């Protein structure tokens, strides 16, 4: 199980190291993972690593029903440690250089994700993909509540967080310098990516140079379809070699989003699930 993923493996059997960058405002109690970061956004990026223990029983069922109990039981966060930016760069670069393709996977989660669950789901995704490269999660404060007003606040935060994701990608491209950079985003995380790409596209040295990102994958992106077609597709072509979009015909979050935003979302499928 997970035979390819050796770069991030630690000495202890079943333990793996992942990286994070977040634009959350630090919470009042750094000793507790649940309160280490809050649900507010700020422009300053914080960096770190987190070590996880993955139970051998972990299966694809978590994608279907990723309950808090299941995450806590099957994916245990053993240590979460903050790093200064330079130490973060050096550690991440070291793993990139030791990976077979000098690759790096960047993950952006979606609406309602809290800091601890974002870390656990990142570990889960890395193991399911079984990718032999380091994995970095860009964690943004999408947990603004389950109400309609909470959704609207989350969209505002997603748009604003594009700036910090752009800063993170810029740091990765310039300082870590992976040969292959992959970017995966889910749901409203797709909006964060769209806004980050818009910022990076305006940098001539990035937009006019050879592509910096190998592959961008968006799953059920909560992005306006017209915005996607008229702006994002053009801009991403200048930055990424490949783009894959997975759509859904029965994603309830996208259906609610369409009602709130009064427009079709790019992650919606026109095909009936029946």
Model-derived regions, located:
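Lipolytic serine-hydrolase domain surface
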Residues: 2-83, 89-99, 119, 123, ...
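Amphipathic, coiled-coil-like alpha-helical scaffolding segments used for oligomerization/assembly
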Residues: 100, 112-113, 184
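Alpha/beta-hydrolase fold active-site loops
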Residues: 103
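The conserved beta1-alpha1 loop
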Residues: 106-110, 220
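Flexible, glycine/proline-enriched loop segments at strand-loop-helix junctions
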Residues: 110-111, 155
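Active-site micro-motifs of SAM-dependent methyltransferase domains
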Residues: 113, 190, 223
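Short N-terminal helix/helix-N-cap motif within the alpha/beta-hydrolase-1
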Residues: 115-117
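Gly/Ala-rich beta-loop-alpha elbow adjacent to hydrolase catalytic centers
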Residues: 165, 185-189, 193
């Amino acid at each position: 199980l997970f035979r390819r993923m050796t770069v991030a493996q630690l000495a202890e059997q079943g333990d793996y190291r992942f990286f994070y960058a977040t634009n959350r405002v630090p919470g009042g109690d750094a000793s507790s993972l649940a309160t280490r970061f809050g649900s507010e956004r700020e422009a300053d990026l914080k960096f770190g690593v987190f070590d996880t223990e993955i139970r051998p029983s972990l299966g694809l069922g978590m994608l279907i029903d990723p309950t808090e109990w299941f995450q806590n039981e099957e994916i245990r966060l053993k240590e979460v440690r903050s790093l200064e930016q330079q130490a973060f760069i050096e550690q991440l670069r070291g793993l990139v250089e030791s990976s077979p393709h000098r690759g790096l996977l960047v993950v952006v989660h979606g609406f309602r994700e809290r800091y601890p669950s974002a870390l656990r789901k990142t570990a889960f995704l890395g193991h399911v993909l079984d990718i032999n490269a380091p994995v970095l999660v860009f964690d943004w404060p999408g947990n603004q509540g389950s109400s309609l007003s909470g959704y609207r606040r989350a969209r505002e935060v997603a748009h604003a967080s594009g700036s910090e994701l752009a800063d993170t990608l810029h740091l990765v491209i310039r300082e870590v310098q992976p040969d292959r950079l992959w970017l995966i985003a889910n749901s409203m995380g797709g909006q964060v990516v769209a806004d980050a790409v818009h910022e990076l596209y305006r940098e001539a040295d990035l937009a006019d140079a050879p592509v910096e990102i190998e592959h961008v994958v968006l799953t059920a992106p909560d992005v306006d379809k017209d915005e996607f077609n008229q702006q994002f597709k053009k801009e991403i072509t200048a930055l990424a070699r490949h783009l894959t979009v997975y759509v859904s015909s029965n994603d309830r979050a996208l259906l609610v989003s369409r009602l709130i935003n009064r427009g079709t979302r790019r992650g919606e499928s026109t095909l009936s699930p029946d």
